[in-house]
From Swiss-Prot:
One of its GO terms (molecular function) is DNA binding. Pfam families: RecR_C (PF21175), RecR_HhH (PF21176), RecR_ZnF (PF02132), Toprim_4 (PF13662). CDD domains: TOPRIM_recR. GO terms for biological process: DNA recombination; DNA repair. Coiled coil: none annotated. It comes from Heliobacterium modesticaldum (strain ATCC 51547 / Ice1). Belongs to the RecR family. A zinc finger (C4-type) spans 58-73. Residues 81-176 form the Toprim domain. Keywords: DNA damage, DNA recombination, DNA repair, Metal-binding, Zinc, Zinc-finger. May play a role in DNA repair. It seems to be involved in an RecBC-independent recombinational process of DNA repair. It may act with RecF and RecO. HAMAP family: RecR (MF_00017). This is Recombination protein RecR. It comes from the Bacteria.
């Protein structure tokens, strides 16, 4: 039995393909979009198509960009001695929001996951290895997520990079600011203890 007009059903189906959007949220979004003025709906559709058509991968760091090389790789004020390796473009945004890191990046576009069929060939590891030939490069910061896949990726990268004479570091993991010890899991507490520093 069809509950929606065919165009509405198609819209709900397409929206439900977005990550984190289930059928109910897709339905809610679809009905919201049908209630906004037509010009707003058209502006959203145009923004999606334009982002899809005009976004490309930086030939240096493989981050998403609208120009090549990207603004970060083109910035002469960035520290070329350090590359921060992240899983996804959104991770670059997260690090940049700290306003503390001034080095370069490399985006892998995923993490090693044999169960999901993601091996080194599916990630942008070969491009990273090519960048290690830069004589200015002194350190690679591995900032993959603290998941099983992220840890496996970090260990794999360390094995590849260390023999090349480049320092490899891993971001610290630990308790979030405002978090209570009693609610932390054992792995998080262990990492917090291992990553302690002198006051």
């Amino acid at each position: 039995m069809r509950y929606y007009a065919e165009p509405v059903g198609r819209l709900i189906e397409e929206l439900s393909k977005l990550p984190g959007v289930g059928p109910k949220t897709a339905q809610r979004l679809a009905f919201h979009l049908l209630h906004v003025p037509r010009n707003e709906a058209v502006a959203l559709a145009k923004a999606i198509v334009e982002a899809h058509d005009k976004t490309l991968y930086c030939s240096v760091c493989t981050n998403l960009t609208d120009r090549d090389p990207c603004r970060i790789c083109s910035d002469a004020n960035r520290d070329r001695a350090v590359i921060c390796v992240v899983e996804e473009p959104r991770d670059v945004v997260a690090v940049e929001k700290t306003r503390e890191y001034r080095g370069h990046y490399h985006v892998l576009h995923g993490a090693l996951s044999p169960i999901e069929g993601v091996g080194p060939e599916q990630l942008r590891i070969s491009q990273l290895m090519a960048r290690l030939a830069d004589p200015e490069l002194k350190e690679v910061i591995v900032a993959t997520n603290p998941t099983v896949e992220g840890e496996a990726t970090a260990a794999y990268l360390a094995r590849l990079i260390k023999p090349m004479g480049v320092k490899v570091t891993r971001i610290a993991h630990g308790l979030p600011v405002g978090g209570d010890l009693e609610y932390a899991d054992q792995v998080t507490l262990l990492r917090a203890m291992e990553g302690r520093r002198e006051l």
